[in-house]
A protein has these predicted regions:
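Membrane-embedded helical hairpins/re-entrant loop segments and their flanking transmembrane helices
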Residues: 1, 176-188, 210-221
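Juxtamembrane non-transmembrane "cap" segments at the membrane-aqueous interface
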Residues: 91-103, 162-166, 195, 226-231
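Intrinsically disordered, low-complexity non-transmembrane regions of multi-pass membrane transporters
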Residues: 79-125
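C-terminal transmembrane helix pair
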Residues: 4-73, 198, 202-282
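Alpha-helical transmembrane segments of integral membrane proteins, especially early/N-terminal helices
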Residues: 24-33, 97-102, 155, 186-191
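Transmembrane helical segments that form the transport core of multi-pass membrane transport proteins
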Residues: 108-202
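Transmembrane helix-loop junctions in multipass membrane proteins, especially transporters and channels
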Residues: 51, 79-87, 150-155, 276-281
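Hydrophobic mid-bilayer segments of alpha-helices in multi-pass membrane transport proteins
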Residues: 62-74, 90-104, 134-144
Length: 282
């Protein structure tokens, strides 16, 4: 629920990996990404009520449910791919390709103090390395999306203020509205920028959500869809490559991205259908 790469700290623990079969380990990337930034996104959505006075708690709950559905679909699809590659019986492997036994626990050498210090240093090193691996993708994709999202500030000419761009994504949203509205039920064509930004960074997409709510371009239904897609996608284009590389399965990165693309779309569709059903009943 904190961030996608947080699951890599568990994947680096041989005592944790011994409970998994080999084909299940690459799917940890999809499972971890499915709930990445979940706590931050949900808290942010609940705070949107300060902008217009509406209660967005039901939308946040529906969005979380949609993210769970999308994560299940993404992980299951990835497991189908990995099961074909590694089989269903091979156990996870440690250093040197030796299978990890469930009844054998790896223990650090040395005293309690030295093991504590070594664990602290290893944790810091893993955290710094994850940041170095992820930041370039986040910067590139988010900058690219921002350039394609906004238009001139005053509608006629560019002034150099924040959020100016060429306005391509809203134009695409208008052209594809006949598809996007039945699938996601989004109120405004500009809303398409939110899930696209979430491909690179769900944190960056939050600023777009607050702007849409402030300009009355998004309602509670849209917030539910945004929550589901931002949680499930959670910047996977910028993190999947680094996460799969850290796990040692770079050749499966394409399949992981494909699986999560389907899962993210299903999360948004599920949130749309669930919220519409609840609104119809109540």
């Amino acid at each position: 629920m904190s961030d996608n790469p947080a699951i890599l700290t568990l994947a680096a623990d041989k005592n944790y990996l011994r409970y998994f079969k080999k084909y299940q380990i690459p799917a940890l990337t999809n499972l971890g990404t499915g709930f990445g930034m979940g706590a931050i996104i949900t808290t942010f959505v609940l705070g949107l009520s300060a902008l217009d006075g509406n209660n967005y708690a039901p939308a946040a709950l529906v969005g979380n449910l949609g993210a769970v559905i999308g994560s299940i679909i993404s992980t299951r699809l990835m497991l189908r791919f990995t099961r074909r590659s590694f089989g269903a019986d091979a156990m996870s492997q440690g250093d040197g390709g030796v299978p990890l036994a469930r009844d054998y626990r790896v223990v650090r050498q040395g005293s309690v103090a030295s093991r504590f210090l070594e664990a602290m240093l290893d944790g810091g090193k893993v955290g710094v390395q994850m940041g170095i691996d992820i930041v370039p993708g986040v910067l590139v994709i988010c900058t690219f999306v921002m350039m394609l999202s906004g238009g001139p500030a005053d509608g006629a000419r560019y002034t150099g203020v924040a959020y100016e761009g060429i306005g391509l994504l809203p134009a695409i949203g208008e052209k594809l509205e006949f598809i996007l509205r039945p699938l996601f039920g989004l109120q405004s064509p500009q809303s398409i920028a939110v899930p696209i930004t979430a491909l690179g960074s769900s944190g960056a997409s939050l600023s777009l959500i607050s702007r849409l709510v402030g300009e009355k371009l998004a309602n509670a239904h849209d917030i539910a869809v945004f929550t589901a897609m931002c949680m499930c996608m959670s910047g996977y284009l910028s993190t999947h490559v680094a996460m799969m590389s850290a796990l040692g399965y770079s050749r499966l990165t394409g399949k992981a991205i494909l699986s999560h693309s389907v899962g993210g779309l299903c999360a948004g569709i599920a949130a749309h259908l669930i919220y519409s059903l609840i609104a119809l009943i109540f």
